[in-house]
Amino acid sequence: MFKELDRLGYEAYLDKYPFHRELGIDLKAYIKEKGGLNKKSLKNKSESVDVNNKVPYPVELDDLIRLHFLVTTRKVTTILEFGVGKSTKVFDHALNVNKNKYESYVTNNLRRSNKFECHSVDTSRKWIKTTRKQFQTDNVRYHYTKCHVSTFNGRICTMYKKLPNICPDFIYLDAPDQYSPRGNVRGISTRHADRLPMAGDLLAIEHFLLPGTLIAVDGRTANARFLRANFQRSWRYHYFKNFDQHFFELDESPLGVWNNRQMKFTSAEDK
């Protein structure tokens, strides 16, 4: 999945698409502090489960590079993002790249009603406002909604109250956190430091997704395993342990002529 990126190199990719500048990241200082683009920062045991933590996690530039790479190389047209933040700006930048290259072809040859749009869902009006203020975007639509503890086929999980009515070809799952979902089922909720995020929204919309759709799950291993155990269609699954990301690709034959065109467009190499 990332062989081309590994061959090119992460720094070379940023030279080609310097989106880090729009994030306000000093690349030399970042590399010096981290010891390299691929070095991970070890979080303390409570950082990701502290209900009082209001500080965004430090940027992981290598993760953002991979997301940008996937959007540009797969010629993604419509993104559904769970959780706003720096990734939102990265998706906006990557969609601009795709729009500049492929807008004419997509408009004239594919059936994409929300072409070159990123729809970002979040439970926090504050973080949406902060992200809007911090990053100017051309292609992002923000969606505030509540999230509740619910069930899928009797299994406890969380569900957003409302999702954007779109047909994404790329989905990024990085939310909700443990403490945003409200309510409980038989006394069980995710609002506990020893619980785990367990979003079930993608299971509910699975049969609306088109063959070729790619899902990226950032960390959230228990959630990724929950999805894998409950998906009903034919998904190819990849887990990259060294950077803790999970990927699901809907590996089915095209649904019809328009889906077939899109899949060929996505897989075709630029000349």
Regions found by a protein language model. Name each.
Residues 1-28:
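N-terminal auxiliary segments of SAM/dcSAM-dependent transferases
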Residues 28-75, 89-93:
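Class I SAM-dependent methyltransferase Rossmann-like catalytic core
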Residues 75-85:
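Conserved class I S-adenosyl-L-methionine
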Residues 86-111:
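Conserved SAM-binding loop of SAM-dependent methyltransferases across substrates and taxa
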Residues 99, 114-116, 210-213:
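A short helix->loop->beta-strand "cap" motif at the edges of active sites that frequently abuts
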Residues 124-167:
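S-adenosyl-L-methionine
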Residues 161-175, 181:
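Short SAM/SAH-binding signature in class I
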Residues 177-271:
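C-terminal substrate-binding/active-site "lid" region of AdoMet-derived donor-dependent transferases
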